Amino acid sequence: CZAADKEDDPNFFKMVEGFFDRGASIVEDKLVEGLRTRQSMEQRRHRVRGILRIIKPCNHVLSVSFPIKRDDGZWEVIEGYRAQHSHQRTPCKGGIRYSLDVSVDEVKALASLMTYKCAVVDVPFGGAKAGVKINPKNYTDEDLEKITRRFTMELAKKGFIGPGVDVPAPNMSTGEREMSWIADTYASTIGHYDINAHACVTKPGISQGGIHGRISATGRGLFGHIENFIENASYMSILGMTPGFGDKTFAVQGFGNVGLHSMRYLHRFGAKCVAVGEFDGSIWNPDGIDPKELEDYKLQHGTIMGFPKAQKLEGSILETDCDILIPAASEKQLTKANAHKVKAKIIAEGANGPTTPQADKIFLERNIMVIPDLYLNAGGVTVSAFZZKNLNHVSYGRLTFKYERDSNYHLLMSVQESLERKFGKHGGTIPVVPTAEFQDRISGASEKDIVHSGLAYTMERSARQIMRTAMKYNLGLDLRTAAYVNAIEKVFKVYNEAGLTFT
């Protein structure tokens, strides 16, 4: 019985390594065949297996303990961690979370997921993750600022933060505020001579060098990734569903940044949210829940419970009767114990690692599509890449706004004058006016437009790659393995072509 319990509640990092091993076993032969060398087949296989062993573990893990003096005069020692999984691309990239559940195992698992996530969407970062072992609700804003700034200095002392080295981002219980504190701390100390110092984080406030469109990026990306599969007639026929969002219902576990924005976009495109779950309870309404109304209620009351246009949900939100289930809370929520009770036909992993290997196996047997975390929630790191790679220090589009607008109006005027010369009678005018859609674009692309466009392109391209891989290896609905295969191929190529520094 104890062994069975352990199997259903695996070590998080071992869980990710297990998914990696599954993908590696499928792609190994192809990697061996693809090596263009004079080596024997045995030597090539040794090389491939050696590189796969290099990819798998975490390269560096930092554990720190530091004291703070709280506002009430009490002294406290804070624990924090930062894991860098891979340096095949730099800087390393990954969020910082504040939670009592933070552990070395968790940050290693999340860092490794970041490596594969970046590879899946072709973002040139290595994977990293950090965590501070606190419950932020138990601290004042002043205490949190002290903790954040001190943790930044601990990272800096060990070379675990910097624009070209390691770039944190928000995660659970952190946001623009914390990123701005980190950026200011770094820029005011060891980065004070570096023009790129504020690029030591992504998603600070706009005034601190942030980018428009980053706040909603993960949620928007989640919607776009779901859209790429839900609009695919072949996959929908396998599930016995019709393409499109119009007649679909969905439930969201977690009403944070990812849950809220994914709910907004799905609602906007015609899907109906029937249930929302948080740590203190869940609500449901078969007629639908409006995301804006629920957001306003939570901002006012600090909870979704008691929302007047829904009733309390008895039982688990993961077992809600819906078409699309979005677990956007924390890891290992879908397990062997509840996988048979899930009624959704599509599981969209908004959180990192919400599905255990045993549950994943059950979903495949039950013909349930799982759109995996390393693809689905990569919208945030994709837009972070746009922010990080903006080397000009100028908002995207700012230099071309007026020129594009004037050029568009000159084009319309030229068409109008040509028509009047050809068809106009007695000098009459033939007005040429933009359509409503063109009018929206006529001023040129704003930074947010450019970010959304780049994000959409990335989502579509990554989805096509996963679909092709799933078809190539006859994986059916096993999109997770297809995504891991893609990630492994790309990371392998970097290591193989770069070679090893010292052997």
Curated annotation (Swiss-Prot):
ADP binds at S395, R461. GTP binds at H212, S216, Y265, R268. Substrate binds at K93, K117, S384. NAD(+) binds at H87, Q88, R89, D122, H198, K389. One of its GO terms (molecular function) is glutamate dehydrogenase [NAD(P)+] activity. Subject to allosteric regulation. Activated by ADP. Inhibited by GTP and ATP. CDD domains: NAD_bind_1_Glu_DH. GO terms for cellular component: endoplasmic reticulum; mitochondrion. It catalyses: L-glutamate + NAD(+) + H2O = 2-oxoglutarate + NH4(+) + NADH + H(+); L-glutamate + NADP(+) + H2O = 2-oxoglutarate + NH4(+) + NADPH + H(+). The active site is at K129. It is found in: Mitochondrion; Endoplasmic reticulum. It is an enzyme of class 1 (oxidoreductase). Its EC number is 1.4.1.3. Its main location: mitochondrion. Signal peptide: none annotated. Keywords: ATP-binding, Endoplasmic reticulum, GTP-binding, Mitochondrion, NADP, Nucleotide-binding, Oxidoreductase. GO terms for biological process: glutamate catabolic process; glutamine metabolic process; tricarboxylic acid metabolic process. Homohexamer. Mitochondrial glutamate dehydrogenase that converts L-glutamate into alpha-ketoglutarate. Plays a key role in glutamine anaplerosis by producing alpha-ketoglutarate, an important intermediate in the tricarboxylic acid cycle. Belongs to the Glu/Leu/Phe/Val dehydrogenases family. This is Glutamate dehydrogenase 1, mitochondrial. It comes from Gallus gallus.
